[in-house]
Amino acid sequence: MTMKFPQYFSLLIMSSLLFACSSESDSETEKSGTPAIITPVPLDTYFPPITRTDEWETVSIETLGWSENQVDNLYTYLEDNDTDAFIILKDGRIVIEKYFGDFTKDDNHAWNSSGKNLTSMLIGIAQQEEFLSITDATSQYLGEGWSSLTIDQELSISIKNQLTMTTGLDYNVEDAFCTDPECLIYLNDIGTTWYYHNAPYTLLDDVIANATNTDFNSYFSEKIKEPIGMQGLFIKVGYNNVFFSTARSMARFGLLNLNQGTWDDTPILLDTAYFNSMTNSSQDLNLSYGYLYWLNGKSSYRVPGSEVEFTGSLIPNAPADLYAGLGKNDQKLYMVPSLDLVVVRMGGASSEILLGPSGFDNELWGLINEIIQ
């Protein structure tokens, strides 16, 4: 088993990561002599077993009527852009599963900010279980003095502000990941600006732990990881709480999202209103952002590290209803309800190091379109 993460984190991670890896089977598509024109076969949604994680149904590109002769172009692009793992699910079944270099299906990789999706869903579950409400003041769970704000300013910040990147805290501090009170300084009134600020997001882990009176990893394992057969662990890396897992575990979570919080017949997130808010525009400052989810198909968007609003869709080549977890160094989890697709990409940065969206998204979807259309 190997793990992918910055070298200077290796000692910390290797001493902490004790979870089991999946031993999942290969899923190369079959080739057979068939007519040039193929009628796609409608498929019901499939859910891989949660107790036998090496078992996962596949469906061939040929059966779906996709273009197999475009797959090599995709693989070349992925390999040229430092990809470790790539998966496409259609109706829950594996269509494409490819690993590069020494990376295998059993290896674990950092999700980086794609893991924000996990935290967002866990907040929804905690609300559904009445441990908290997203309209509650953050101070209710972190106590007075969690920031350098006045008491009244602290009380004005809600969990929803943390979910939507609208806390108004100063993102120009020396370390925007720092969650110490001296790093959390007033800049703008809540709800008046959108800025991708990691520190307020990270504090949601403490909100969940204190609201549920349990360990954050334990609550996540009980409510999401174990019920859907995921493997993995959140590990503290500096101020950040980073999730590590196999690519297939990321695909499982994508499938849970695609089915709106239900795994097979087991409801995980029952609150449909929360799920809909989570995966739709959560405010009018950045239409392409829900509750820690990135959204495609909107008229404008903002990106990490910038105060500029850009016109147009976040990923023009991708379906308009796509929503996603987008992490540093191009960790990607895409869900497309209209096509019943989940797409996973793990690896290194394709070019410059960015915290979320990048040009890689649009280039990748251009190549995926050549296969599925």
What role is predicted for each listed range?
Residues 164-240:
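A small/polar active-site loop signature that marks catalytic segments
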Residues 129-167, 214-246:
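Active-site helix/loop module of the DD-peptidase/beta-lactamase fold
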Residues 92, 109-135, 162, 204-208, ...:
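Active-site SXXK
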Residues 22-104, 109, 127-132, 164, ...:
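N-terminal leader/targeting segments and the immediately adjacent pre-domain N-terminus
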Residues 339-348:
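Short, well-ordered beta-strand elements
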Residues 17-20:
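C-terminal motif of bacterial Sec signal peptides marking the signal peptidase cleavage site
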Residues 1-10:
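Bacterial N-terminal signal peptides that target proteins for export
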Residues 229-337, 350-358:
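Penicillin-binding protein/beta-lactamase superfamily catalytic region
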